[in-house]
Amino acid sequence: MREAAVQERVAIARRPVWERWRRRAVSREFVLGLVTLVAFVVLWEAVARSGLFPPWAFARPSQVVNAFVTTWQKGELQKNTWASVQRQFVGVFLAAVAGVPLGIFLGASRNFRAAFLPICRLVYPIPGIAWIPLAILWFGIGFKSTVFVIFFTGVWPVLFNTMAGVTSLDSQYTDVARVYLAPRLFYVWRVLIPGSLPFIITGLRLTYGVGWRVIVGAEMISSITGLGFMIDDARWQLRPDVMVAGMITIAMIGWVVENWAFDYVERITIERWGMKAVAR
C-alpha cells in the first residue's frame, strides 16, 4: 500500500509543472476558488463604499490597485520587496544548513538526542518576535537582526521534521548498511537523506512559511526597509491602501514560491534522491 502511494506521488512529481497547473486550471476546485475570490472582492468594495469605516481606515480595492501602481512607479515596492526576499532567502538557507544536519544527528543518535532534544524542546516554544530586542542589541537595526529572527524561528520545523524522517526510516535499510559495513558518510548520504527526503522537504516548506510570516513583524521593529517596514510606515501615514498592497505582495510571493518553486524542487529531489528507486 505504501509502495502504491509512493508510485502515485512520483508519477505526479514527474509531470511538468505546466501540465500540473493546466490540470488544476480546469478543475472544479479552481473555478470555485475563482468565484469565491471575485465574490470577496465585490463584498470588499461594497463594505468600503457603505460608510461603515472611515476612508483613512478602510481602503477600496480600486485604491489598493492604485497604490500598487504608484509604489511601483516610485520604486518603493521593488526596493522593499527585494529587501524582504533577500532576508527571507538568507534566513531560510541558514535554517536549512543548520536544521537538516542537526535533525539527522538527533534522529540517528540516541545519545545525541538524549543530550540535546530537551534543550531544543525548551527553546522551540519561544516566539520569534520575542527575540527581536536581543537581536537588535546583538546585531543592530537592519539586515542581520532580521535574518537572525527568521533563522531562529525557521530552524525548528526543518530540524524536527528531519529528525522524524530519520527515526521513522524502515529498519531494514539500517540493517543492510550495518551488515555490509557501509561507511558512515555513505550511510548518511545514500540511506538517511534519501529515506528522510519527504520529511525534509515538508520541513523546508514549513520553515519558509514561518519565516515569511515572522519577517513582517521583524521588519516593522528592526529594519528601515522591507515589506514589513513599508506596511508599518503606511500605518503612520494613514494609508490603508499601501498597507493592503504590501500584504497582498507578501501573499503573492508566498503563493508563487509555495506552489511553483517547492513543487519544482520536490519533483527534482524525489526523482534524484528519494522515491524513484523505491517506485521501481
What are these language model-derived features?
Residues R121-P157, A164-G165:
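Generic hydrophobic transmembrane alpha-helix motif, especially the helices
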Residues A59-V69, Q73, W212, S222-R235:
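Short hydrophobic, aromatic-rich alpha-helical segments embedded in or entering the lipid bilayer
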Residues F148, F152, R184-A218, D241, ...:
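Transmembrane alpha-helices
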Residues R14-S27, R49-L94:
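Periplasmic/extracellular loop-to-transmembrane helix junction in inner-membrane transport proteins
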Residues V90-C120:
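Transmembrane-helix boundary motif in ABC transporter permease subunits
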Residues P118, V158-G203, L227:
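Short cytoplasmic-facing helical segments at TM-TM junctions of multi-pass membrane proteins
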Residues M1-T36, F262-R280:
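Transmembrane alpha-helical segments of polytopic membrane transport and secretion proteins
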Residues L227-Y264:
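Hydrophobic alpha-helical transmembrane segments of polytopic membrane proteins
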